[in-house]
Structures are given as C-alpha cells and as structure tokens.
C-alpha cells in the first residue's frame, strides 16, 4: 500500500506500463511464431512478409527497452537464416 501521493502515482504508472509492455511483448512473440510456422509449412511468401513485420516489431521493442538490442538482432538473424535455409532446400 503506497504511503505517499507520489508512490500512488508510481503504482498507477507501473501498472499501466506493465500492461502495455505485456501486450507489445505478446504481439511480438506472436509475429515471430507466425514466421516460424510459415517456414515449417514451406510457405515462403508468407514467411517473408511476416518477417518484415517481425523485424519492425523487434526493432520497436528494442528501442523501447522492452528487449535488449542484441536480443532483437539475434532473433532477426535466426529468423532470416530459417527463411534462407528453407528457400535453398525448396
């Protein structure tokens, strides 16, 4: 229970930010999952389109300190390699 008005305000801000971050993180993970599923189903067009969306969401999350910039770069690299390998085998 907050004892001061500033503590009450921080509590409200933290809750609001937590919900926004949670939604953003969930959205980002869903997009990454769609890329992986498209690659598994050998649907390279969809995979490439979803990858573009995933790149944007990962960069936005890194810019807002939701994830580390290196984690975003690593995830983008791995997704890109997945798509490239699927294209070579197809």
Swiss-Prot record:
Segments for region (Disordered):
1-28
Molecular function per GO: small ribosomal subunit rRNA binding; structural constituent of ribosome
RNA-binding is among the record's keywords: yes
GO CC term (a single one): small ribosomal subunit
Cite the entry's keywords alphabetically. Answer: Ribonucleoprotein, Ribosomal protein, RNA-binding, rRNA-binding
Could you tell me which InterPro entries the record lists for this protein?
A: Ribosomal_bS20, Ribosomal_bS20_sf
Q: Which GO terms describe its biological process?
A: translation
**Recorded superkingdom:** Bacteria
Please give the NCBIfam families that the UniProt record associates with this protein. Answer: S20
The similarity annotation says: Belongs to the bacterial ribosomal protein bS20 family.
What does the UniProt function comment say about this protein? Binds directly to 16S ribosomal RNA.
PANTHER family, alphabetically?
Answer: 30S RIBOSOMAL PROTEIN S20, SMALL RIBOSOMAL SUBUNIT PROTEIN BS20C
Q: Can you say what this protein is called? A: Small ribosomal subunit protein bS20
Species for this entry: Rhodopirellula baltica (strain DSM 10527 / NCIMB 13988 / SH1)
- The gene for this chain is rpsT
């Amino acid at each position: 229970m907050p004892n001061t008005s500033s503590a009450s305000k921080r509590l409200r801000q933290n809750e609001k930010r937590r919900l926004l971050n949670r939604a953003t993180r969930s959205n980002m993970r869903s997009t990454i999952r769609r890329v992986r599923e498209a690659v598994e189903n050998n649907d390279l067009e969809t995979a490439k389109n979803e990858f573009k969306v995933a790149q944007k969401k990962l960069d936005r999350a890194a810019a807002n300190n939701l994830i580390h910039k290196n984690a975003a770069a690593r995830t983008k690299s791995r997704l890109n390699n997945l798509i490239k390998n699927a294209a070579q085998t197809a």
